[in-house]
């Protein structure tokens, strides 16, 4: 049996018994839902009060991942912002791998990726940066409190590519 990271003891041995968990019954010719004729207008945001730079790097030999040269420490606040303000975050991937950058609590707009304007305005919580790319994000800080930002690849996050944002 393959080593499954400690899970082997909890898994049944022998042939599996498939079980039906759900029956889904749908009409043969479903009616399409109507789409709105126009999208909701996008709110006008105040001018950004600060531009921050976050640099994503990695040390593959040590299997460590960094933001601004540091691995995650839950006791450290990496960024401090003010509620009801808007910031620009420039997130640069100096590593050799793609990194999907994720921010909790505060949806953002992608202004550009790789120097090219983003093709449409939308609220996002993840933007993927290929090796060498820079993403410019417009980040409204609406809620007070602590939250995190990190690479959305769990192995990268667990090995250090995460930081703490505190909004006061």
Pin down the residues of each PLM region.
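Short, hydrophobic/aromatic beta-strand segments
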Residues: 99-103
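Extended terminal and domain-junction accessory segments
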Residues: 1-98, 140-146, 150-168
């Amino acid at each position: 049996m393959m080593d499954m990271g400690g899970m082997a003891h909890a898994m049944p041995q022998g042939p599996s018994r498939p079980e039906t968990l759900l029956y889904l019954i749908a009409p043969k010719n479903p009616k399409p839902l109507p789409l709105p004729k126009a999208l909701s207008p996008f709110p006008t945001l105040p001018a950004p009060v600060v531009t921050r730079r976050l640099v994503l790097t990695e040390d593959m030999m040590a299997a460590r991942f960094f933001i601004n040269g540091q691995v995650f420490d839950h006791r450290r606040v990496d960024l401090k912002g003010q509620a009801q303000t808007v910031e620009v975050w420039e997130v640069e991937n100096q590593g050799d791998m793609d990194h999907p950058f994720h921010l909790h609590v505060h949806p953002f707009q992608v202004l550009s990726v790789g120097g090219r304007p983003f093709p449409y305005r939308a609220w996002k919580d993840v933007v993927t940066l290929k090796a060498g790319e820079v993403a410019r994000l417009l980040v409204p800080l609406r809620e007070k409190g602590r939250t995190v930002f990190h690479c959305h690849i769990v192995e990268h996050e667990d090995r250090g590519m995460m930081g703490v944002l505190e909004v006061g």
